[in-house]
Curated annotation (Swiss-Prot):
The gene is dam. It comes from Salmonella typhimurium. S-adenosyl-L-methionine binds at W10, K14, D54, D181. This is DNA adenine methylase. GO terms for molecular function: S-adenosyl-L-methionine binding; sequence-specific DNA binding; site-specific DNA-methyltransferase (adenine-specific) activity. NCBIfam families: dam, PRK10904.1. The keyword Signal does not apply. Its EC number is 2.1.1.72. SUPFAM superfamilies: S-adenosyl-L-methionine-dependent methyltransferases (SSF53335). May be involved in methyl-directed DNA mismatch repair, initiation of chromosome replication and gene expression.
């Protein structure tokens, strides 16, 4: 089956893991994603309804605009994908415009340009909330028109919310399945490449996410979580059934060092016996 790509480039995007995720994702009517990111899982599953959330307000605003003003958005965005916009001076001018822009539609148009022309598809903000990714110097950035239209069509059955993982998981009911793709736990003390947004994700929040998953499955709502395979994640997810998969990281400081690493898919499934928490 053909896989559908997201229209955004995204750190930690789940496109490479789709087959593994779909293999372990339980059936249900509604998929709840508290960390929707670029939406690869949403775009490649067939639930009747979707509740898609993220803490990044720019991302959720963009998705609602693509859903509701598709043709207008595609036309406006296409105008920025020109040879004359593929230069550092123009990129930094448009980045500055984005950081001062108050108009949601124009901001969404600029967001796609910055995503495709910026370095490595990163979405990163400084402590003042300003987008600060440098120019990417790509030969000819791709304009994802087909991907935008596919997203917009699929989004007619989705609701997008800018809110915390706890609030979006609270929306799940007995007809729901929850898939969580949190900013990954560090592999080591120096591996802290998880603060893609100004709200970085703490170890306390990682543990809290697992607690919410335990509460949901006790109410017969299944939860699947992806994360690095570490001693900490195995401790957090000790009540889940763990599946190990290998994946090559999509983003690294050095493209030549993107070696495959072990990741966990932690499945909290109603009715499946799990060991007691230690």
């Amino acid at each position: 089956m053909k896989k559908n790509r997201a229209f955004l480039k995204w750190a930690g995007g789940k496109y490479p893991l789709l087959d593994d995720i779909k293999r372990h994702l339980p059936k249900g009517e509604c998929l709840v994603e508290p960390f929707v990111g670029a939406g690869s899982v949403f775009l490649n599953t067939d639930f009747s309804r979707y509740i898609l959330a993220d803490i990044n307000s720019d991302l959720i605003s963009l998705y609602n605009i693509v859903k509701l003003r598709t043709d207008e958005y595609v036309q406006a965005s296409r105008e920025l994908f020109m040879p004359e916009t593929n230069q550092a001076e123009v990129y930094y001018q448009l980045r500055e415009e984005f950081n001062t822009c108050q108009d949601p539609f124009r901001r969404a148009v600029l967001f796609l340009y910055l995503n495709r022309y910026g370095y490595n598809g990163l979405c990163r903000y400084n402590l003042r909330g300003e987008f600060n990714v440098p120019f990417g110097r790509y030969k000819r950035p791709y304009f994802p028109e087909a991907e935008l239209y596919h997203f917009a069509e699929k989004a007619q059955n989705a609701f997008f919310y800018c809110e915390s993982y706890a609030d979006s998981m609270a929306r799940a009911d007995k007809s729901s399945v929850v898939y969580c793709d949190p900013p990954y736990a560090p592999l080591s003390a120096t591996a802290n490449f998880t603060a893609y947004h100004t709200n970085s994700f703490s170890l306390t929040q990682q543990a809290h996410l697992a607690e919410i998953a335990e509460n949901l499955v006790s109410n017969r709502i299944p939860v699947l979580i992806s994360n690095h395979d570490t001693a900490l994640t195995r401790e957090w997810y000790q009540l889940a059934k763990l599946h190990v998969v290998k994946v090559r990281p999509s983003i690294s400081s050095n493209g030549g060092t993107r070696k495959k690493v072990d990741e966990l898919l932690a499945l909290y499934q109603p009715g499946v016996a799990t060991p007691a928490r230690k």
